[in-house]
Every structure is written in structure tokens, then in C-alpha cells.
Amino acid sequence: VVKKKAKYQSILINKKRYYFYKVTWADILGDSGHATVEEFNKMETALMISYGYIFEKTKKHLKTFASFDSKEECFSDRNIYPTGCIIKLEKINI
């Protein structure tokens, strides 16, 4: 049995390849009102899902973008996540 290598969704910009990911992350929840102990204990972070190309991943941050210029090295729809908030990264297959 010959196993095929997985092909992942990616783009090439200025000779650099960027891969498309599903990013699952914990979002901070804040409330400036008064609350009881019971209400406070019920607070939880929101589990968020974002999709984008990974621009850079370091020990401290994950940088993503979702839009780009087809003729220039220019990025839009950008996000930067603290790595401590990242729960899961999934590379998207074609």
C-alpha cells in the first residue's frame, strides 16, 4: 500500500509559502459589573474558532492573516494571538 502525502491548502507570496489553518483559541471574558461568588465562579472563557494563513509562529505569539494582495506583499485581516490562548492548530487539507 502506497501512502499519499497529504496536500495542504497554501499560497505562495514573494517566494514564501503560507499554510491555511483552523485556529481554536480561548477568548478572554470580562465583566465590569458587581457579581456574587456563585456568578463569578460560573464565568468561563469563550472557545473561539478562526481560519487564516499562518504568517509567523513563535514561542510567544501566533500571527495570522486571511486576505492578501495578489500583486504585492501586502496582508489584511490580521490577528496576533498569545500562544497561551491557542488550544489547537489544524492544517487544512485541500
Language model segments and positions:
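Conserved RNA-binding domains used in RNP assembly and mRNA/RNA metabolism
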Residues: V2-I94
